[in-house]
Amino acid sequence: MAYDATKGTKPVFEIYKKDGWYKDFDVVVHDECAADITDPTYVENILKAHREGVPAVNLHCAMHSYRWGKFQQPVKAGDDNAHWYEMLGLQSTGHGPQQPIAIAFTDKESPIVKGLADWTTVNEELYNNVQILGAKTLAKGLQKVPEKKDKKGKVTPASEANAIVAWTNEFGPKKTRIFSTTIGHNNATVEDARYLDLVARGLLWSVGKLEADGKASAGFGK
């Protein structure tokens, strides 16, 4: 595991600077929050692993990492600021307030979510969807924000938002398996057995060790 103690959004992992850094990895879990890392050469060396067939599991803030230029707008395929989003399979640029998210699994036949029950999180961040870049939806989230009145009496009306919150993608010439979920801002969510089951299944799927019934292949589960 590579850990960077940076508390901001500029974590730099020395391992990512090395040629062939990924040669001994079966899968890479991206759980970094690197929104202000904007060096294309550094990012391309990360992406090289996935172009060459190493699967990825992307969690929460990984979706808002390695972005620059006019990333708030839909990126154009092939541009240097599009490559990270192309690996993810979906472009997201921001989120709303922390409120519970009602998660509904949409692809009932995917082994990643087969048999999983819909559930509602504790307060979480619902990441927006700017555009889909190959993602295959597994789950969507609905977040309702209640009416709010500030100290001056100004009222912000109640609202609701929908977004894809879990998906798969096939990336690059080798159609590398990619699993991503935007859920997971708070520890209470990450500790939830339902969240852990989803991520574990996504990881097993990415490395080809998840059976059609949603159970781990022999030797890869409890």
Show which residues each predicted segment covers:
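Acidic (Asp/Glu)-rich catalytic clusters
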Residues: 19-21, 48-52, 168-171
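Oxidoreductase and adenylate-handling cofactor-binding alpha/beta cores
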Residues: 81-90, 119-123, 130-135, 196-211
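A glycine-rich, often tryptophan-bearing local segment used as a flexible ligand/cofactor-contacting loop or short
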Residues: 35-115
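Catalytic beta-strand/loop cores that center a nucleophilic Ser/Cys/Thr
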Residues: 90-91, 95-174
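Structural recognition of the beta-strand scaffold that forms the well-ordered cores
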Residues: 1-4, 26-31, 50, 55-60, ...
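Acidic-and-aromatic substrate-binding clefts and catalytic sites of carbohydrate-active enzymes
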Residues: 7-15, 35-40, 158
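Aromatic-Pro/Gly-enriched surface loop or interdomain linker
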Residues: 1-25, 210-211, 216-222
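Extracellular ligand-binding/catalytic regions of CAZymes and related secreted enzymes
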Residues: 145-222
